[in-house]
Amino acid sequence: MKISVIGAGNVGATAAHRLAEKQLAHEVVLIDIVEGIPQGKALDMYESGPVGLFDTAIHGSNDYMASADSDIVLITAGLARKPGMTREDLLMKNAGIVKEVTDQVMKHSSNPILVMVSNPLDVMTFVAHASSGLGKERVIGMAGVLDAARFRSFIAEELNVSMQDVNAFVLGGHGDSMVPVVKYTSVAGIPITELLSQEKIDALVERTRNGGVEIVNYLKNGSAFYAPAASAVEMIEAIVKDRKRILACTTLLEGEYGINNVFCGVPVKIGKNGVEEILEINLAPAELDALKHSASLVQENCKSLEALLA
């Protein structure tokens, strides 16, 4: 198993190290355009092996040839958000970056699974799919896993319970229009509505929607990377180990939930073939409307990129 990570910034480097520590591949390759950065970070990670108790080979390069014959490629490349910048502000610049990255990846790997992290996530997943020529099941966006992790952590903090006992789904686009689904949120099987007031739930939902912005505002010059990296690795682990995990991920919808030809976050089964099944769960009318609205915003942004992808 060979996994390449494109982008040696905070998310990419953190994910690469986590992949190595969990020994999910015999080789992890870190690629970046800045000379010395992927090489130095990869060497530093490799030297942590004796202490971290892993034998994964880790290499850094500025040449996409190093990614040749990758089974999975994690794409994190792109510009980071700055305070006051929305994901949509990043749209055109990152779309060009992701198209170029995908073109380079596909020159050297014939049928990889692409896991997308670059923002705006849903639109960048669309760009990667359009540029790669891969089947829709092999291009997956990391959105709901991260958003659900934030929602779960906030609930656990509020109730003073273990995060492991909190289950939640967050659907829709990875942005302000995301849809935390309260109906399927529980703590050790107990519906969240029996444990928290509606007012408190609404506050936690709103905090989840602004989870990325909250961190950006603290950091001033940067954005979240520990949780995004961990979320991407959780998806990759499900693929590598064929675990058939049910996770909320961005995938191409073709009629599911009444949504057509849009990449949007929904519950899917993740295994060795990527997205192996899209699950259509029952949503309250307001939640379904919110999901469709979220998808429509993604579709609008995708249409603005038609010239770039022509």
From Swiss-Prot:
Residue ranges that the Swiss-Prot or TrEMBL entry lists as coiled coil: none
Listed EC numbers: 1.1.1.37
Substrates-to-products reaction catalysed: (S)-malate + NAD(+) = oxaloacetate + NADH + H(+)
Pfam families: Ldh_1_C, Ldh_1_N
Aminoacyl-tRNA synthetase is among the record's keywords: no
NAD keyword on record: yes
Binding-site residues, substrate: 81, 87, 119, 150
Active site per database record: 174 (proton acceptor)
Entry binding sites for NAD(+): 7-12, 32, 94, 117-119
Record-level Gene Ontology MF annotations: L-lactate dehydrogenase activity; L-malate dehydrogenase (NAD+) activity
The protein's role, per its UniProt record: Catalyzes the reversible oxidation of malate to oxaloacetate.
Similarity-based family: Belongs to the LDH/MDH superfamily. MDH type 3 family.
Name recorded for this polypeptide: Malate dehydrogenase
Organism: Chlorobium phaeobacteroides (strain DSM 266 / SMG 266 / 2430)
Gene that produces this protein: mdh
